[in-house]
Amino acid sequence: MSFDGFFLHHMTEELRRELLGGRIQKINQPFEQELVLQIRSNRQSHKLLLSAHSVFGRVQLTDTTFENPAVPNTFIMVMRKYLQGAVIEAIQQVENDRILEISVSNKNEIGDSVAVTLVIEIMGKHSNIILLDKSSGKIIEAIKHVGFSQNSYRTILPGSTYVAPPQTGSLNPFTVGDEKLFEILHTEDLEPKRLQQIFQGLGRDTATELSGCLTADKLKTFRAFFASPTHPSLTEKSFSALLFSDSKTQLSTLSELLDTFYKDKAERDRVNQQASELIRRVENELEKNRKKLVKQEEELLATENAEEFRQKGELLTTFLHQVPNDQDQVELDNYYTGEKIIISLDKALTPNQNAQRYFKRYQKLKEAVKHLTS
């Protein structure tokens, strides 16, 4: 099972049992797309993991130990401002979608009550963790900012009004009426893919298991499936909130199940991400150095004119009395080659200043050679 709406339904019940009325004591962000809230509830400390990871997105209690960054970023500082010390008032799933809302109350700097909602959207690469002002519906902060150019349907930026993800029109399998459900079960194709289209929040594994159950009394079987008590279990390739036909190992809670299932997978993914980031940085540095080398080679080539500038300065100094004041060039005897040489002049400068100009060019290129070859 993926972390679908069906699984989140059962997880929401688990979180309510453990966290309602609890107080948020600490907020940390151990990884870029993950938030960990330390909550004191029922005389126990719990760690609530909220993940907006594109592959491993989920919400769960965890016993995993995380290392936190030494310097908090803007996102985590805003989260701490609004959530530290807050009391959890409500935890609810939106329909049977992969969206969880955690409503909390807190006090601001002057003692006034502040109500905010933490929205966790588990939607693959579009997963997000968003903090809302409850009264206005405005976004305070989000772990992923989404501008209009990225999504024309809704922007996820501080100050924007929160707009929920678009609805597909599918039915909530937990609340659909008997009459409508009976009609669907006796007129529709009940293959897994079709069940996913009709009913909200069914992953492929859940839909496959449900399809296999719908045999004789379909209405009764359907209701029993969605009323089944939670039985966290590992399957051949994944995990489930119920005992599925391919279940292998049972665990005591859904959170323990996810800790067991994701521990090695998430760690490997983080290592791969860090390796990819390191490779990207090395490649960027190599590209910068290649460009720098090309530029230095061009500059080094230009320094080959240094000796020519020195000789022109020497010739102008030697034959200073032959250099006119108002001309843009002068022809002199070049005692270095035994031939005539034409030297360009700046008419705005005196003969001596023109000579010094060539010496300055020579010195500049000479220093450049030292720098490039050091």
Q: Which functions belong to the PLM regions below?
A:
Residues 1-374:
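Extended, highly charged segments
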